[in-house]
Amino acid sequence: KVENRATGIVMNVKTGEIVAMAVKGDYDPNNPFVIADEEERARIAELPEEEQQEATSAALQAQWRNKAVSDTYYPGSVFKMVTLSMALEENVATEETTFTCTGSYVPVQGERAINCHNTSGHGTQTLVQGTMNSCNPFFIYLGQLLGTETFFDYFEAFGFTQKTGIDLPGESQSIYHDRDMSLMDLAVESFGQ
């Protein structure tokens, strides 16, 4: 159940060392073979007997999984700072760059519109204002100025296409791995989705 879990990592930003890690949606390590989720236990109990063992095994594997290491999540709006740094480094944007946010933006003709969190729009904003407003359409625009090739080159340079190498088992693969990203991929990845 996604709504009943949380994951947190505290990292030494100078060394990358994991200082603390916690996952809520856990189990009792003194009784690791007891399914902690009461609803899941009840659901399994209702299954035909021949299906219960497989369902129990799957539920136990899911609760033992270290979601901080083994699951992959989109970075969300914090990724906008990466897009911003790319745009500034490549000189495709400056502090004077402007973009008019109308509340949504169609990055690729014929595709769906992508909404801003401010559905009435921010109006015309500078680079600083677009960043302060965390405006998704503004960052889509920056991504388009960069283009897919340059954008992916930075993905690789920042190490986003590789595993971190954390000294824990089960690290998942990156969600960013396709150099042949579409223009719609570029649009959503430019603001962290």
Set out the residue ranges of the language-model regions.
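Short loop/turn motifs at secondary-structure junctions and domain boundaries
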Residues: V2-N4
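Beta-lactam-recognizing serine transpeptidase/beta-lactamase-like catalytic domain environment
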Residues: A6-V78, V82-Q193
